[in-house]
């Protein structure tokens, strides 16, 4: 009798172990997709890095700003009257050159300052990475912009000033402003174009990073690393 009880108990134990093993075997499949906030943050940073590498790099080429309507730097409102005034007195070529050199300065500055943007991405901390991951198509870029704009401006503005001198924008715009201010009866202007161009160039950088972020979010083929594939699969 005891042997029968032992045999039944053994069979029950073995059966229970088998069922338990089946449950255990199923657990990795259920939990392997769970990522920590740090993992997701790393994926978001990688997406931003790709934005700099693949999209912002396009801005550093000749006409990278000028020929891209998404980021082309146009004159601020206060200088549109300057542009019109020059064209009215037959100086359209000079007016065109003024717009072109603003974009040339931005192209040169972004080329020089790319490491600044890379460092900004490295230094970013996502307090709630999952919320950003599940946010809008440009949520990570917006987070970068909101968190780093002031610091980036401080570092980028001197680069713009150097680029202004390098591409001749200082000289051309001194000539433009002088000629405009000499037109009878016009209100004199004295714009700070390095400040304006700094802000516009930074907007262009964020715009292009956002282009790549959207690609990664919406196109599986743009997720070129295992980390990107794993992280962004969560928001599909």
Predicted feature locations:
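An amphipathic alpha-helical core segment
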Residues: 159-200
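Alpha-helical transmembrane segments and their juxtamembrane interface "caps"
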Residues: 59, 91, 112, 142-143, ...
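C-terminal motif of bacterial Sec signal peptides marking the signal peptidase cleavage site
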Residues: 13-16
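N-terminal Sec/ER secretory leader and immediately downstream segment
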Residues: 23-101
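Bacterial signal peptide processing site
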Residues: 18-21
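Mid-length scaffold segments of soluble, non-membrane domains
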Residues: 93-163
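A cross-kingdom marker for long, charged
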Residues: 201-236
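Sec-dependent signal peptide recognition
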Residues: 2-8
